[in-house]
Swiss-Prot record:
Subcellular localization(s) per the UniProt record: Cell membrane
Listed GO MF terms: glycerol-3-phosphate O-acyltransferase activity
Gene: plsB
Family (UniProt): Belongs to the GPAT/DAPAT family.
SUPFAM superfamilies per record: Glycerol-3-phosphate (1)-acyltransferase
Keyword hit for Transferase: yes
Pathway of action: Phospholipid metabolism; CDP-diacylglycerol biosynthesis; CDP-diacylglycerol from sn-glycerol 3-phosphate: step 1/3
Assigned GO CC terms: plasma membrane
Protein name: Glycerol-3-phosphate acyltransferase
NCBIfam families, per database record: PRK03355.1 (NF002886)
Reactions catalysed: sn-glycerol 3-phosphate + an acyl-CoA = a 1-acyl-sn-glycero-3-phosphate + CoA
UniProt free text on domains: The HXXXXD motif is essential for acyltransferase activity and may constitute the binding site for the phosphate moiety of the glycerol-3-phosphate.
InterPro entries xref list: GPAT/DHAPAT, GPAT/DHAPAT_C, GPAT/DHAPAT_LPLAT, GPAT_PlsB, Plipid/glycerol_acylTrfase
Length: 775
């Protein structure tokens, strides 16, 4: 038998030591005893007793030996020891999958497998020792933190501490990607703070709380950690194998995670996102995350598999269950206190429009409570941008926008979802980790004033979450898919040649370069005709572009049935052009008024910001004005030109590159206009569902009549935010002048649509002139 690779550092000193050895097989007993002999050979004066580590579930009577050892001397050290079985190097995907089967876990080989390992590769058997602690220190910690009452309770506590110490030692060997919490349920249930809070909930019992903790538990194992990348790759097999990272961001995040626990808040466009985050952490050898997911995804084999991969399933509706809310809050607090990382979508659900949704505060409130309660010196909110060249889910989103129903999750749905991933090449996945947001910076020090001031705390949470979302937006790279889709949506079904596409896209690329906006490699390749051809061909066959190549040269366009799918991609890039689009519309508005045009320009820019605030993220008012001034500064003496006559503004718009408001924002104001039109004869207090149904009907009529530019405006998703707009404008609640104010609002939207038409006219005339010169 070859010599095992044992850890023989002198962890046993001359002090009186109790060695708690976890050894269940003859091979493990022999390895541990050999290790102890080596310890004695290195230090002949050491004094120690060896006791087999009791099982956590043993009856109190079985703990007698440990109780006696702990009572013998308060100053003696306790050192936990066990054999760590390393898995074989370079295991295949199949071997990793087999590791979940009974008797195949490489980290816990059976007796026969252990003998085989010692004969063939004994270096995989490593004796490890956890950090030591004095009995007196353990006893004090036990008294301070648990509800234990007798020596048997203390012995069970020491057993748990020993197991956790050995887990930490093994994690240091394997790497941070294997770090995961252990013994969460017994640790929480035994804690003094948990029991104290439980007593304040009427009718709450430890047994019921334990069941809820079981429901939240992940069942994480090292074998399942190895499987994370395999599962993630299976779900994303339609994408290129290499995820696109910013290595500088990864390095910065690695340093930050070494200092504080973090909550990774990711943008959410696809079910794949929940798999991408764990894969990204593992590929970059970063600590794993516990991803929160709705319990609706815990079905069939999906539930156990995801749990073992670190997913925490939570109930959707918990408002009327104080015990569940308390258990969830304490669970989150325990995780961050032990410096493990959590993750969920900051938007709370998938964005079916491609835009960032407003942040949800629910789970974040629990994390803030844990921080303010002093369970961590700081907690980092790590923004995570996840974006894709293409998604197969756009077809589902388009159907939903047209009024269809959401497909319920289940076995059939899962099969279809996984099957769809292999139907074609969806391009690349992009993951970005912008600078983390410090909870301490926004909430102040733990135990501060926000503990008592709930209104101030909520405001701070809102500002903090919006900052996270803003950093996600700023870090998300613009893709070729988004730019091409935005361009072809403006033609309203008219096909463009390769040269037309290439020439028109250059203005947008120039703008992005000037603004130093992050762009993908596919977007950079749009500088060449070959790059444009690759981009439109990748989207052809109705995904969402159609190519016609039966004539002299191929042309590309978007059919009416694919407008909603194309809009999903276009919407992902609007944030990069939002303020420059508002400049165009404010200029066009000032062009059509008499009087102080500068005053009108600024008033309209702020008004557009107010109307669009439910669809897009904006900087605060002062920063927004500064950004607008920067955007319009492309023209020297712009203040004088805006204050001049209409011809000066025309000249400014003619020289602006790009003119893009029509491509980016028209559809949203058309949706608002449809809702405002429906409101003319809708009753007061009309509900969102009823108003949406009416708007869908009227919108389809207007598309047929050509009164709106495309069917893209007729969308349940856009009407949902349009409803928020009219509520914000006080156009729903009963009032004596309600009908009049509804008409005024509708006229305002018609004026804005006129401004779109004016900008589009200039852009179209410029396009025609360029085409004429090129022939």
């Amino acid at each position: 038998m070859t010599e095992p690779d044992v850890e023989i550092s002198s962890v046993l000193t001359g002090e009186d030591t109790l060695v708690l050895a976890s050894m269940d097989t003859p091979a493990e007993i022999e390895l541990v005893m050999d290790w102890l002999c080596q310890q004695r050979n290195r230090n002949p004066d050491i004094k120690f007793d060896v006791l087999k580590l009791p099982s956590r579930n043993l009856a109190p009577a079985a703990l007698t030996a440990l109780v006696e050892q702990l009572e013998s001397d308060e100053d003696r050290s306790v050192v936990p020891v066990r054999v760590f079985w390393m898995p074989p190097a370079e295991r295949s995907k199949l071997a990793k999958l087999a590791g979940l089967l009974p008797g195949r876990d490489p980290y816990h080989p059976n007796r026969r497998q252990q003998r085989h390992i010692l004969k063939t590769d004994a270096r995989r058997a490593l004796v490890i020792a956890g950090d030591s602690a004095k009995v007196s220190e353990l006893r004090q910690y036990w008294r301070d933190t648990t509800v234990g009452e007798n020596e048997c309770d203390f012995a069970q506590f020491v057993t748990r501490r020993a197991i956790l110490a050995m887990e930490r030692a093994e994690s240091r060997i394997l790497g941070p990607q294997y770090k995961s919490p252990r013994l969460v349920k017994p640790e929480i249930l035994a804690s003094t703070r948990f029991r104290a809070g439980l007593e304040k909930i009427s009718g709450a019992t430890v047994e019921e709380a334990g069941k809820m903790l079981d429901e939240l538990a992940t069942g994480w194992s090292r074998a399942s950690v190895d499987l994370v990348s395999v599962l993630g790759r299976m779900l994303s097999r339609g994408f290129e194998p290499e995820i696109d990272y910013d290595e500088y961001q990864v390095a910065a995040m690695r340093a930050a995670l070494e200092a504080h626990p973090a909550v990774l808040l990711f943008s959410h466009r696809s079910y794949i996102d929940g798999a991408v985050v764990p894969v990204a952490m593992q590929e970059n050898r970063l600590p794993p995350v516990h991803v929160f997911a709705g319990i609706n995804l815990s079905f069939g084999l999906m539930g156990p598999l995801l749990r073992r991969s670190g997913v925490i399933f939570i109930r959707r509706n918990i408002g009327d269950n104080p015990l569940y809310k308390y258990v969830l809050r304490e669970y989150v607090g325990y995780i961050v206190e032990k410096r493990f990382n959590l993750s969920w979508s900051i938007e709370g659900t998938r964005s079916r429009t491609g835009k960032m949704l407003p942040p949800k505060l629910g789970l974040l409130t629990y994390v803030a409570d844990a921080y303010l309660d002093g369970r961590s010196e700081d907690i980092l909110l790590q923004p995570v941008s996840i974006s894709f060249d293409q998604l197969h889910e756009t077809a589902e989103y388009a159907a939903y926008a047209r009024g269809g129903e959401k497909t319920p999750e289940g076995v059939a749905w899962l099969y279809s979802f996984i099957k769809a991933q292999g139907e074609r090449n969806y391009g690349k996945i992009y993951v970005r980790f912008p600078e983390a947001v410090s909870m301490r910076q926004y909430l102040g020090a733990p135990h501060g004033a926000l503990v008592q001031d709930q209104d101030a705390k909520r405001l701070a949470l809102q500002k903090m979450s919006f900052e996270v979302a803003w950093r996600i937006l700023c870090a998300t790279p613009v893709t070729a898919t988004a730019l091409v889709s935005a361009l072809l949506l403006t033609t309203r079904g008219v096909a463009l040649t390769l040269d037309q596409l290439h020439h028109t896209l250059q203005e947008s690329l120039d703008y992005l370069e000037r603004k130093q906006t992050p762009v993908s490699k596919s977007a950079l390749r749009l500088r060449s005709r070959e790059g444009v051809r690759a981009a439109v061909d990748a989207l052809s066959s109705g995904h969402p572009i159609t190519r016609v190549d039966s004539g002299r040269e191929p042309v590309w366009y978007i059919t009416p049935g694919n407008e909603h799918a194309a809009a999903f991609y276009r919407n992902s890039v609007i944030h990069a052009f939002l303020e420059t689009s508002i400049v165009e519309l404010a200029l066009a508005h000032a062009r059509h008024v008499e009087g102080d045009r500068m005053k009108v320009f600024w008033a309209q820019a702020m008004r557009l910001r107010d109307l669009l605030k439910f669809d897009f993220y904006f900087a605060d008012s002062a920063a927004f004005r500064a950004n607008i001034a920067e955007e319009i500064a492309w023209h020297q003496n712009w203040e004088d030109r805006v204050s001049g006559d209409g011809d000066d503004i025309d000249a400014m718009l003619l020289t602006k590159r790009p003119l893009i408001s029509d491509a980016m924002l028209r559809v949203f104001f058309e949706a608002y206009d449809i809702v405002a039109d429906v409101l003319r004869d809708a009753p007061a207090d009309v509900g969102q569902k009823e108003l949406t149904e009416l708007a869908l009907g009227v919108g389809r009529q207007y598309v047929a009549q050509g009164r709106v530019r495309s069917g893209e405006s007729v969308s349940t998703l856009l009407f949902a935010t349009a409803y928020q707009v009219v509520v914000d404008q006080n156009l729903i609640a009963p009032a004596p002048d309600l009908a009049e104010r509804r008409m005024v609002f509708r006229r305002e939207l018609r004026d804005i649509r006129r401004d779109f038409d004016y900008v589009e006219q200039i852009a179209r005339s410029r396009f025609i002139v360029r085409e004429f010169k090129s022939r």
